[in-house]
Amino acid sequence: MESTMESTATHVSHEAISGGICSDRYEIEVPLDHFGNDGAGEAVKVSFRVLAGKSSSQDKYLLFLQGGPGFGSPAPWTASSGWIKAALDKKYRVVLMDQRGTGLSTPISCRSLEAMGDAPAQVAYLKHFRADSIVQDAERIRESLGVRSWLTLGQSFGGFVSVTYLLTSPGSLEAVLLTGGVCIRAC
């Protein structure tokens, strides 16, 4: 059973980047426990950026799911080269999500874990930072942007998250691209 908490993204900042690229940063509050098993209604913040070029379409979105786990999304000023530039040139808006626990999203640190108490309490908290929860966060972001479906690009651990997305919410995906270090085995 998935959580019914309604999530609305809050616009935090707008930044012009070289080459006519714009970066808009948002935050969205999502349930700590999307599946209603525990968490007592706690929420975490997920931060994301939407990069758009001069000719980006209003309905073509690419969600980048970075490797790790534990790394924030790429810096938006890298948008003028590499794969981000290629996606923008193909008129996609690129969504860079700081997965829960990383970057500008609600962080996980030694200090925050110690404050939770013993190891079982820490494990109970950390189980909400797996791929299935990241997929649900992405779904909340997609819905808040009013996007029917999008393309995902999963790099390394992000590829694992993309495959999890494909298995749990295939109707939300236009296509899935995987790169680097993904081992897919039968469950």
Question: At which residue positions do the language-model features occur?
Answer:
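Gly/Pro-rich cap/lid or specificity-loop segments adjacent to the active site
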Residues: M5-C187
